Amino acid sequence: FAGIDCLADIWLNGKHIGKAENMMIEHAFDVTKEIKAGESNQLQVILRSSVIEGQKHLLGTFSIGNFPSEESVFIRKAPHTYGWDILPRLVSAGLWRDVELRVLNPARLTDVHYMVANVDTATRNVRLYTDVQVKLPFEKFDKVKAVYTLSRHGKEIYKGSSVVVSPAFRYIMEIKNADLWWPRGYGEPALYDAKVELVDSDGTILSTDNKRVGLRTIQLDITDINLPPDHPGKFCFIVNGEPIFIHGTN
């Protein structure tokens, strides 16, 4: 379930397989034992009122500076549906994203996360961490390898591999003369196509993860703003070592 709004119990063929209490995240349930192969299956999503559920937690008071819809703070759903300055109150409910049945390989990537550890702005050399989690049958460990590829505009920039010996591991890429990601007005927001593949000993690709990655560092340089005028405080974002002027409106 890519999106359930918001409080729901899920049933498959008359069996309760799970529940949802958060509009903002995906929900996945293992239905291996409940699903009937080659037959019709009945999937039911029973929704409960987010308003009624939230009202169970009310204290009976609210700030006159806020909308009188304090039940919204107890439920993980879009708060603007309870009434906002841009639209009237219309509390929604239902499936707001796709529902799909996934058949998963017992040997697969379960999570891939990229983190820029360091950027040398003078040489544009970048150290990129790739944190990987996998699900593998025990006998596959030490026989399967992870292959890492980084490309830009269809051109392969980096390729490497490592043997998988544990369900969670980190791989470090050293990228030379990289195209850095910059915010608007400071340069090109360059993106790379990053791919991780699980490859069996016979060359079979068991699982693939594709993402787009920007190579940059972002820091917040902050000091106490309640200082005398001759020592003003600081609140500044630093991207790739360069102070960035943040502008915009709400």
Model feature map: region roles:
Residues 1-250:
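Secreted/periplasmic carbohydrate-active enzymes, especially glycoside hydrolases
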